[in-house]
Amino acid sequence: MNPLIIKLGGVLLDSEEALERLFSALVDYRESHQRPLVIVHGGGCVVDELMKGLNLPVKKKNGLRVTPADQIDIITGALAGTANKTLLSWAKKHHIASVGLYLGDGDSVKVTQLDEELGHVGLAQPGSPKLINTLLEGGFLPVVSSIGVTEEGQLMNVNADQAATALAATLGADLILLSDVSGILDGKGQRIAEMTAAKAEQLISQGIITDGMIVKVNAALDAARTLGRPVDIASWRHAEQLPALFNGTPIGTRILA
């Protein structure tokens, strides 16, 4: 069975209750299914807390974090360090053998600079599946941060949704984007069960889909097109539904290619 990539985001990394729910669901799923799992994560809340503590400004452009040269080391420490190791510690607590990685390990995801105005922000492209497939064959849970590196050795902060998409293309994996919200909402706050590119363009033009959700929807649409299959956006809040989600039952918004 092809792997499943679970991309974690939102305040999940900042909530012990949420992490307990997630890893309990992962344990239940792994006990009843042989499907290999990979976690990809960002950690915007961890970065924001650190930046605030250091009195550094947080600037975003089109939903992407601007990352100046003097901040990339801090952001790398927050994402590839604190956020990654927090997830590894929760895996350890739940007796899941895990390995912490960043996008550059094994050239799993290739990264180039996205836009000079954004600074150290990377564009992710599929890379080599060899390392992660080896880990999956050994029964490990790879936990991959959204920090990448260019061919020139420059560290880059990559949008985690886009990083997960590139890794899914690398591995031929299915993709779930877990976030704080139950899916994409319409103008009345109701969950939209299925989303096409045309529907997304309409909601963006109407101002219903805004800011970071535009990035998330575009990443999911890109993933669906790249992978040739649907991608799910769903919430981590309903732990009892997560095993069904991991098994292919939509509980949020299903993005169609």
UniProtKB/Swiss-Prot annotation:
Keyword Zinc annotated: no
Keyword Transferase: yes
Pfam families registered for this protein in UniProt: AA_kinase
Site note Transition state stabilizer, residues: K7, K216
Keywords: Amino-acid biosynthesis, Arginine biosynthesis, ATP-binding, Cytoplasm, Kinase, Nucleotide-binding, Transferase
SUPFAM superfamilies xref list: Carbamate kinase-like
Primary localisation category: cytoplasm
InterPro entries found in the cross-reference section: AceGlu_kinase-like_sf, AcgluKinase_fam, ArgB, Asp/Glu/Uridylate_kinase, NAGK-NC
Family membership noted in the UniProt record: Belongs to the acetylglutamate kinase family. ArgB subfamily.
NCBIfam families given in the database record: argB
UniProt protein name: Acetylglutamate kinase
